[in-house]
């Protein structure tokens, strides 16, 4: 394993869906040679077109110069041949279906095709791959959980397995941080990792309030965006508790838990929406209605980029 010169690492990304294409774009933008694998050539072509569109948006926002578009696209090699995709990779990042059988099959092939020092990673958001994957040299197996859109969102959760080595963990952390990501290391693969657990805890309570008719989804969203929005750009729950007062949080944590939602099932409201085909942006309606999916997604990405830019400027000014 090459722990030095991580900027020279070759990256193989498996799966050219939404996450895979964005991860490939991110590494290519940062100067890496990237092979992007998808078994369906048509889907691979669509992914490359979307990457070029994403780059165009970043040019419009002033994030990258126009010439970076061609440089980035030239750094991505699309292929439907798995063995070819991973042949010279320093790290392989898997982004295939969240199914145990799929991951078992692909990692078995990776074990055959890759050298013993190639880091094998999964972008799974829900699965404890360490419980069911069997590979030689398990010390090189790790989870790198990116967030959508992966070429924009700063965070990557790096999750260690019981046999993941310190050397591999540090090398992956160095790679990601060197390319500008913020890394949060989780020392045990707990379900949902860090962010999905917190996200679902908030969503469960928000759904509970809405289902009981205490507030509308719109007003709940307004309350969260107008408070968590600005605060959570620079402090997390522990930093926030320090400013509010740990003694205040002690009282809240004593009084509120008995009346908070403790359901262990999916909210009925959500089940009903799925049954009715109200799946969100991709179906045109969820909690809100949407007309032009491409425009809605593009506008959202632009909001995220501009917010990150603004936060970075403030942090630099306040440093």
Model-assigned labels for residue ranges:
Residues 1-57, 61, 113:
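NAD(P)+-binding Rossmann beta1-loop-alpha1 motif at the extreme N-terminus of oxidoreductases
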Residues 2-7, 32, 181, 186, ...:
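NAD(P)-dependent Rossmann-like dehydrogenase/reductase catalytic/cofactor-binding core
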Residues 7, 40, 65, 165, ...:
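Helix N-cap / loop-to-helix initiation motif
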Residues 20-22, 103, 125-129:
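Short glycine/serine/threonine-rich phosphate/pyrophosphate-binding segments
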Residues 30-32, 158-189, 200-230:
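Internal alpha-helical scaffold of NAD(P)-dependent oxidoreductase catalytic cores
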Residues 43, 57-119, 127:
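Rossmann-like NAD(P)-binding element
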Residues 119-196:
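Rossmann-fold dinucleotide-binding core
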């Amino acid at each position: 394993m090459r722990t030095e010169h991580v900027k020279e690492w070759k990256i193989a990304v498996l799966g050219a869906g939404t996450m895979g294409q964005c991860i490939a774009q991110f590494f290519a933008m940062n100067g890496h040679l990237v092979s992007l694998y998808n078994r369906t050539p048509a889907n691979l072509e669509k992914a490359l077109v979307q990457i070029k569109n994403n780059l165009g948006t970043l040019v419009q926002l002033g994030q990258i110069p126009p010439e970076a578009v061609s440089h980035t696209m030239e750094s991505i090699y699309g292929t439907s041949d798995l063995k070819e995709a991973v042949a010279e990779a320093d790290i392989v990042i898997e982004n295939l279906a969240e199914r145990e059988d799929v991951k078992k099959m692909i990692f078995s092939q990776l074990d055959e095709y890759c050298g013993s020092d190639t880091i094998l990673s999964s972008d799974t958001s829900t699965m404890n791959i360490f419980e069911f994957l069997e590979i030689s040299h398990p010390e090189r197996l790790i989870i790198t959980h990116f967030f959508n859109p992966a070429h924009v969102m700063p965070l990557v959760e790096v999750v260690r397995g019981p046999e993941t080595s310190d050397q591999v963990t540090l090398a992956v952390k160095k790679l990601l941080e060197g390319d500008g990501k913020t890394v949060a290391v989780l020392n045990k693969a707990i379900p949902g990792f860090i962010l999905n657990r917190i996200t679902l805890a908030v969503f469960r309570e928000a759904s509970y309030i809405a289902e009981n008719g205490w507030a509308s989804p719109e007003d709940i969203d307004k309350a969260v965006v107008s408070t968590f929005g600005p605060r959570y750009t620079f402090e997390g729950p522990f930093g926030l508790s320090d400013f509010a007062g740990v003694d205040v949080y002690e009282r809240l944590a004593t009084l509120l838990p008995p009346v908070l939602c403790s359901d262990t099932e999916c909210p009925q409201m959500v089940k009903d929406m799925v049954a009715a085909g109200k799946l969100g942006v991709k179906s045109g309606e969820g909690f809100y209605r949407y007309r032009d999916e491409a425009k809605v997604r593009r506008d959202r990405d632009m909001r995220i980029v501009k917010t990150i830019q603004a936060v970075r400027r403030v942090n630099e000014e306040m440093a």
